[in-house]
């Protein structure tokens, strides 16, 4: 895979339920703490090294941001780091939270 792929919220939910992918959330810490998808890893510049060391490069990775825009750049970056199958979740966390459950920090 030389280019990341787009994935819908529904397809993301299916892959996560089947434990077929890891989900990373690149939103700021305050937003992540306030609410995130269960099982998501908060990926920041500070956690990137640990994530790449703990995750097999052949594990599919789905990138989530606010609206599905920033995740595209992050997905491409992860491909360049050596991950073989990377997705950008269309609509981001805002699309997910409209119809699917999430972990709330409140």
UniProtKB/Swiss-Prot annotation:
The reaction(s) this protein catalyses: thiosulfate + hydrogen cyanide = thiocyanate + sulfite + 2 H(+); thiosulfate + [thioredoxin]-dithiol = [thioredoxin]-disulfide + hydrogen sulfide + sulfite + 2 H(+)
Residues covered by the Rhodanese domain: 17-104
Keywords per UniProt: Cytoplasm, Transferase
Subcellular location: Cytoplasm
UniProt xrefs under SUPFAM superfamilies: Rhodanese/Cell cycle control phosphatase
GO MF, any single term: thiosulfate-cyanide sulfurtransferase activity
InterPro entries, A to Z: GlpE_sulfurtransferase, Rhodanese-like_dom, Rhodanese-like_dom_sf, Thiosulf_sulfurTrfase
Active site (UniProt): 65 (cysteine persulfide intermediate)
Highest taxon above the source species: Bacteria
Listed CDD domains: GlpE_ST
Coiled coil spans: none
Keyword Cytoplasm: yes
GO CC annotation: cytoplasm
EC number(s) recorded for this UniProt protein: 2.8.1.1
HAMAP family named among the record's database cross-references: Thiosulf_sulfurtr (MF_01009)
Family the entry assigns: Belongs to the GlpE family.
PANTHER family: FAD-DEPENDENT OXIDOREDUCTASE, THIOSULFATE SULFURTRANSFERASE GLPE
Role this protein plays: Transferase that catalyzes the transfer of sulfur from thiosulfate to thiophilic acceptors such as cyanide or dithiols. May function in a CysM-independent thiosulfate assimilation pathway by catalyzing the conversion of thiosulfate to sulfite, which can then be used for L-cysteine biosynthesis.
Protein name: Thiosulfate sulfurtransferase GlpE
């Amino acid at each position: 895979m030389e280019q990341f792929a787009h994935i819908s919220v529904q397809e993301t939910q299916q892959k996560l339920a089947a434990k077929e992918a890891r989900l990373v959330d690149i939103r700021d810490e305050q937003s992540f703490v306030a609410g995130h998808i269960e099982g998501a890893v908060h990926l920041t510049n500070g956690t990137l090294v640990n994530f790449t060391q703990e995750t097999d490069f052949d594990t599919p990775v789905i990138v989530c941001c606010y609206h599905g825009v920033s995740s595209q750049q992050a997905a491409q970056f992860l491909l360049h780091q050596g991950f073989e199958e990377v997705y950008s979740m269309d609509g981001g966390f805002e699309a997910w939270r409209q119809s699917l459950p999430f972990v709330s920090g409140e």
